[in-house]
């Protein structure tokens, strides 16, 4: 009996110690998962305000099945946390970048300008007249150069849509299903009510009596609704470059992947590895993703799920960008 009692006592002590040990480890896990990041930070290099976007899972793609085929199928995506610029990169920020960085590393070995030409400031001023307006006429290469200099990067397409949705499910736009020109700078100052699309009356209300000029707007020009993360102009104003290579079938590939069978695909990115892309982006020749619509876009192109693309050399008066950076413990 004494032997049995001793075995029982020692066994009970071991069980108690095991429970305490596990509890301490669980406590550590909870503590790590409860790490609080600053919701808004000022990025030192370029002075941009950035919002903390808490990672999580969402369904990516066209919920309403009213867009293009490349917006389907919907698929579950899990993203790690990141910071995103509240506003698009401005003319002033880009000018500062050029003043600090423009040197031989932006030219070919023979000294001739190639994929990194100097901006035509007169053209830019016609559509973005002040340093507070979004930078335009920037190629994907230009945006990548800026992001690298600033210690940031372009968002993946999945990060962009996740941020634009702002935690909302199944909406056409970051704020809801209805759009008019008090909510976004789109349609070239005319809105989208004259569209031949069958659902145009449902999507767009009448433009205001005093339509804005057909050009970009700076922060504060439009008393728009912002998405729940506090980001601005995620719909319209300027289309925004993403890091991804364009792949019209990427959503289907994600849906068919082994990862999705486990519940969701983690941090999807079309074009290899992000680290490799950041190091070798000047060798890229394939089309890149554009998101968000622009000041002269029809409201169909302003939808959260709308996908677009262009060659990395492409520049336009309606194309700009914003940056992200990873959030690590």
What does each of the following model-derived ranges do?
Residues 2-9:
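Bacterial N-terminal signal peptides that target proteins for export
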Residues 20-21:
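C-terminal motif of bacterial Sec signal peptides marking the signal peptidase cleavage site
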Residues 24-33:
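Bacterial Sec signal peptide processing site at the extreme N-terminus
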Residues 36-52:
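GGW-centered surface loops in extracellular recognition modules
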Residues 60-66, 78-183, 244-248, 325-329:
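Active-site microenvironments of metalloenzymes and redox enzymes
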Residues 66-77, 169, 234-329:
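Surface-exposed recognition segments
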Residues 74, 120-132, 191, 303-308:
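Short glycine/proline-rich turn/loop motifs
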Residues 131, 185-235, 251:
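Short, well-ordered junction/capping motifs at the entry into regular secondary structure
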């Amino acid at each position: 009996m004494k032997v049995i009692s001793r075995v029982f006592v020692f066994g009970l002590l071991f069980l108690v110690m095991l429970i305490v040990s596990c509890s301490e480890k669980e406590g550590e896990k909870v503590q790590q998962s409860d790490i609080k990041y600053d919701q808004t930070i000022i990025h030192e290099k370029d002075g941009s305000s950035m919002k903390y976007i808490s990672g999580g899972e969402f369904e990516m793609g066209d919920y309403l099945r009213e867009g293009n085929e490349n917006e389907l199928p919907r698929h579950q995506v899990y993203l790690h946390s990141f910071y995103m610029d509240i506003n698009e990169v401005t003319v002033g920020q880009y000018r500062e970048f050029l003043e600090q960085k423009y040197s031989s590393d932006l030219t070919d070995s023979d000294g001739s300008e190639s994929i990194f030409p100097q901006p035509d400031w007169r053209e830019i001023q016609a559509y973005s007249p002040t340093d507070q307006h979004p930078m335009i006429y920037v190629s994907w290469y230009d945006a990548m150069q800026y992001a690298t200099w600033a210690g940031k990067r372009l968002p993946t397409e999945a990060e962009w849509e996740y941020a634009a949705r702002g935690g909302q499910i199944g909406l056409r736009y970051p704020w809801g299903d209805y759009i008019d020109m008090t909510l976004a700078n789109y349609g070239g100052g005319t809105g989208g009510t004259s569209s031949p699309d069958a659902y145009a009356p449902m999507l767009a209300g009448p433009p205001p009596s005093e339509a804005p000029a057909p050009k970009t707007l700076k922060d504060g020009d439009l008393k728009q609704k912002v998405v729940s993360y506090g980001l601005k102009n995620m719909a319209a104003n300027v289309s925004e470059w993403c890091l991804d290579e364009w792949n019209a079938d990427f959503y289907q590939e994600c849906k068919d992947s082994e990862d999705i069978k486990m519940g969701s695909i983690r941090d999807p990115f079309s074009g290899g590895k992000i680290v490799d892309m950041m190091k070798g982006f000047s060798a890229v020749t394939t089309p890149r993703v554009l998101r968000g619509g622009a000041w002269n876009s029809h409201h169909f192109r302003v939808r959260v799920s709308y996908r677009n693309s262009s060659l990395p050399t492409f520049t336009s008066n309606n194309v700009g960008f914003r940056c992200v950076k990873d959030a690590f413990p």
